[in-house]
């Protein structure tokens, strides 16, 4: 009897199990079909999945590749910057949350420094916001101030995240290219690339909410002069437009040039957000600290975005950065101040890259600022038949060069909208904030390549 009951229970249980499996299969297919619709991306990121840094950083990850692509230093940051972080990491209280809009000692140091540069008082609590890198500053600014239906003017070439950030806010990017003046019998300079004032004004209208300015410029290295900035300022005032001024390379300006802040122009402080970067200032890109400076009536909206997204930035990094700033603020007129010594060091590296590229018949555009140099590489004319045909020339060239020559760079058309890619697709960008040994290795590759061609 017991065995019979057990057998019946087993059969009953098996039947239930099979029924469950059968039902779950049916339900599983049904649920999967329904849920797959919910796995689709939000419309605001439609078409934004391609990213030049993801693609080309992966290619350059091979240790045998000389990486002149991504814009990070392989030179050492200042010793005192690293020492400050080491000391601060040992202080228990500085390993906890700090003020969400910027660690008190850091915003105080920033206000002291920028009051000298702006020649005006800056409220450290209301007019400065510390962010997760300059990216964080851009994101906060665009999310806080740009709305669906707005238009934002982007100057081509532009740093590649500008367009996706504008589109994610539901706004429309409006493009205007820098155009080169004719160059006869002299070196090509970033100052030869200018905006046409009439063409620029044609991009402004009642929907224009902002223009994004980048000076010193990435990737061209252009440093806008006073006359050029005045044209932009006049149009911003005339059309009641905001200016988002990306000035992360503000200290990296070379002989004969001067960095000017558009926020210091009459009528511009009240409509400008200026963006800075610790990574570019002290060669610590991995720290991911940036800041926004502007009037309280704008900064308060950026604070709203930050408090509801990342909330705060790393306390020990902010304290170490504050102490590093104070060290250099106290010696700003001294050649040893990093704000003065780094551009001098980089100018030598820039000139070396210019000579190298010219020696193999290429035509570089000599940058007046920043730490990138772009060059027309069409004369090298390699066989790119094994590369994908549906990509711009510079994408194919850089992939070919990385694979076959073990030298990486960044295609300049990545900094362009679709309509202007053809204007820049014969250019690639090299980064020269590198150790001499890295530049030596790049020189060997380029010179050997030139010999093979001849």
UniProtKB/Swiss-Prot annotation:
Top-rank taxon: Eukaryota
GO biological-process terms attached to the record: 2-oxoglutarate metabolic process; amino acid metabolic process; biosynthetic process; kynurenine metabolic process; L-kynurenine catabolic process
Cofactor(s) required for function per UniProt: pyridoxal 5'-phosphate
Residue positions where N6-succinyllysine is found in the record: 116
Keywords in alphabetical order: Acetylation, Aminotransferase, Lyase, Pyridoxal phosphate, Transferase
Single GO molecular function: protein homodimerization activity
Positions bound to substrate: 71, 218, 429
Gene3D superfamilies documented for this protein: Aspartate Aminotransferase, domain 1, Type I PLP-dependent aspartate aminotransferase-like (Major domain)
Membrane spanning residue stretches: none
Catalytic activity: L-kynurenine + 2-oxoglutarate = kynurenate + L-glutamate + H2O; L-kynurenine + glyoxylate = kynurenate + glycine + H2O; 3-hydroxy-L-kynurenine + glyoxylate = xanthurenate + glycine + H2O; an S-substituted L-cysteine + H2O = a thiol + pyruvate + NH4(+)
Pathway annotation from the record: Amino-acid degradation; L-kynurenine degradation; kynurenate from L-kynurenine: step 1/2
Protein name: Kynurenine--oxoglutarate transaminase 3
Organism: Homo sapiens (Human)
């Amino acid at each position: 009897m017991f065995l019979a009951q057990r057998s019946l229970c087993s059969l009953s249980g098996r039947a239930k199990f099979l029924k469950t499996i059968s039902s779950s299969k049916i339900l599983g297919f049904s649920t999967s079909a329904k849920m797959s619709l919910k796995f689709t991306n939000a419309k605001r990121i439609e078409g934004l999945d391609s990213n030049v840094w993801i693609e080309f950083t992966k290619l350059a990850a091979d240790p045998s590749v000389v990486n002149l692509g991504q814009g990070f230093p392989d030179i050492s940051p200042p010793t005192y910057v690293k020492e400050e972080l080491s000391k601060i990491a040992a202080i228990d209280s500085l390993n906890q949350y700090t003020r969400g809009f910027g660690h008190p000692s850091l915003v105080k140091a920033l206000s002291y420094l920028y009051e000298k540069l702006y020649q005006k008082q800056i409220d450290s609590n209301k007019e400065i916001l510390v962010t997760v890198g300059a990216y964080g500053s851009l994101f906060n600014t665009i999310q806080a101030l740009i709305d669906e239906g707005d238009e934002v003017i982007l100057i081509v070439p532009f740093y590649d995240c500008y367009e996706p950030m504008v589109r994610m806010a539901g706004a429309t990017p409006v493009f205007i290219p820098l155009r080169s003046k004719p160059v006869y019998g002299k070196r090509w300079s970033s100052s030869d690339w200018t905006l046409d004032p009439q063409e620029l004004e044609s991009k402004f209208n009642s929907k224009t909410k902002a223009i994004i300015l980048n000076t010193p410029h990435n990737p061209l290295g252009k440093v806008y002069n006073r006359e050029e900035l005045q044209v932009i300022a006049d149009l911003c005032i005339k059309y009641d437009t905001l200016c988002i001024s990306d000035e992360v390379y503000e200290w990296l300006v070379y002989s004969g040039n001067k960095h000017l802040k558009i926020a210091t122009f009459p009528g511009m402080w009240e409509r400008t957000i200026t963006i800075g970067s610790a990574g570019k200032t002290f060669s610590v890109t991995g720290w991911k600290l940036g800041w926004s400076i502007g009037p309280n009536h704008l900064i308060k909206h950026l604070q709203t975005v930050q408090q509801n997204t990342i909330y705060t930035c790393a306390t020990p990094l902010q304290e170490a950065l504050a102490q590093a700033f104070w060290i250099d603020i106290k010696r700003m007129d001294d050649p040893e101040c990093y704000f003065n010594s780094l551009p001098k060091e980089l100018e030598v590296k820039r000139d070396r890259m210019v000579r190298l590229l010219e020696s193999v018949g290429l035509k570089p555009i000599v940058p007046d600022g920043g730490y990138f140099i772009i060059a027309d590489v069409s004369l090298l004319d390699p066989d790119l038949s094994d590369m994908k045909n549906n990509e711009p020339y510079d994408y194919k060239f850089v992939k070919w060069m990385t694979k076959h020559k073990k030298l990486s760079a960044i295609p300049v058309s990545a900094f362009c909208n679709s309509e202007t890619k053809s204007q820049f697709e014969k250019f690639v960008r090299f980064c020269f904030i590198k150790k001499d040994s890295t530049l030596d290795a790049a020189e060997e590759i380029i010179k050997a390549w030139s010999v093979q061609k001849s």
